[in-house]
Regions:
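Sec-dependent signal peptide recognition
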Residues: 2-10
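C-terminal motif of bacterial Sec signal peptides marking the signal peptidase cleavage site
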Residues: 15-17
């Protein structure tokens, strides 16, 4: 904990004097700002890597042969006025003020333990209407929308070499690359804020085949494929908030759907474009009323004539206009090692100025990816 505090203190001090404006938005080649691992993630919290476009956030594991990309939309929350007829805006405790005089008296008498116990009991929210799917009563929580599972299908024994996954902070791109049975595989992921889509590109040096499925823990009320666009509709049990997901597959191979599984065959590449929306509307008193299907369809209509390079260039221009405003140079890092090994070394007091630089810029990457105008 002390080490992390030291990193935070250093980057805050240095950042005050290291800001500059860059309007050219040219791709950077700073390899010190590439954070990478040499193995797939097994834990969502500590190893999976985040992406976002201000509306959708996703976490990718980099699995082989199956990739999992977990994602959600920023407004997909339980709770709210539609979660219960007697909703009072979040476990409100209307009697809390009555205990303030007693608390003040206890504190004046230096009876702090008693004051703390009373405050914990009477000044905090009272959980109401708890039920199996609403453990904290009216206190809602962000929900996982679901996961894409994308599997390379092959009859060969699946051995891999030269594995690498990570995030290039210069571009805001996630990546996975490896070799299996003489075939080079490459994945490029990014969130595009201007076009409101998440983009996942899979490439291979020889034609390959894939299966793609979308799993959600919530109730679904519709699944359809028309052309190269797949859609899924569902809702939350807690407050009946509706959500919709559109996915578009572009590929040089064949694409078809059977049941709720998408098959991409004989492809050197395919690109999965993902849009998601909910019925949330920022209007009192119900905060509901948007049409998520219409929102997603409009997003896809707007990119209907756009190529992958168009969408890529839009993302780079938008991201780098913000990211390139600040440079921080503390010294050479140990970027020949994966980030998890560097963290272990750092915890053992091995100097790694580049790691401190990465953490500073990684924080900025998360803010750019997760908090944009129009989002939550």
């Amino acid at each position: 904990m002390m080490i992390l505090k030291a990193i935070f203190f250093i980057i805050v001090l240095v950042s005050i004097s290291c800001s500059k404006t860059n309007t050219e938005n040219q791709p950077s080649t700073n390899e010190d700002l590439i954070m990478w691992y040499n193995k797939p993630a097994t834990d969502w919290m500590t190893e999976a890597l985040p992406l976002g476009n201000g509306y959708i956030g996703s976490m990718f594991f980099g699995g082989v042969p199956t990739e999992e990309i977990q994602f959600t939309e920023g407004s997909l929350w339980t709770g709210g006025p539609d979660s219960h007829p007697k909703y009072n805006f979040g476990n409100n405790n209307p009697d809390a003020h009555e205990f303030l005089p007693v608390l003040r008296e206890l504190m004046a008498e230096d009876r702090f333990d008693e004051a703390n116990e009373l405050a914990q009991k009477e000044l905090t929210s009272k959980i109401q209407y708890a039920r199996p799917t609403q453990y904290y009563g009216e206190f809602g929580a962000q929900q996982n929308l679901g996961s894409f599972f994308i599997t390379v299908t092959t009859d060969k024994a699946y051995s891999i070499s030269d594995y690498k996954r990570g995030i290039d902070l210069n571009t805001g791109h996630g990546f996975v690359q490896y070799t299996s049975d003489g075939i080079d595989y490459k994945r490029t992921y990014f969130g595009n804020y201007p076009d409101k889509v998440m983009v996942y590109r899979f490439e291979s040096s020889e034609p390959s085949s894939y299966t793609i499925s979308l799993s959600t823990p919530h109730y679904t009320s519709g699944f359809a494929m028309y052309g190269n666009i797949i859609s899924k509709t569902g809702y939350l049990e807690d407050n009946n908030m509706r959500f919709h997901v559109n996915s578009r597959i572009d590929s040089d191979g064949s694409v078809h759907c059977s049941g709720d599984t998408i098959y991409v065959n004989n492809a050197n590449y395919f690109v999965l474009y993902n849009a998601a929306a909910t019925s949330y509307k920022n209007e009192f008193p119900h905060y509901s009323g948007n049409n998520p299907m219409q929102i997603c369809n409009t997003i896809f209509d707007n990119i209907a004539s756009s190529t992958y390079n168009d969408i890529l260039n839009n993302q780079l221009s938008d991201y780098q206009e913000l990211f390139n405003r600040v440079e921080l140079e503390l010294g050479k890092g140990n970027n020949d090692k994966p980030i998890d090994e560097r963290l272990v070394d750092y915890s053992n007091y091995t100097q790694d100025l580049g790691l401190e630089e990465i953490y500073f810029q990684y924080g900025r990457y998360l803010m750019i990816s997760g908090s944009r105008k129009g989002g939550m």
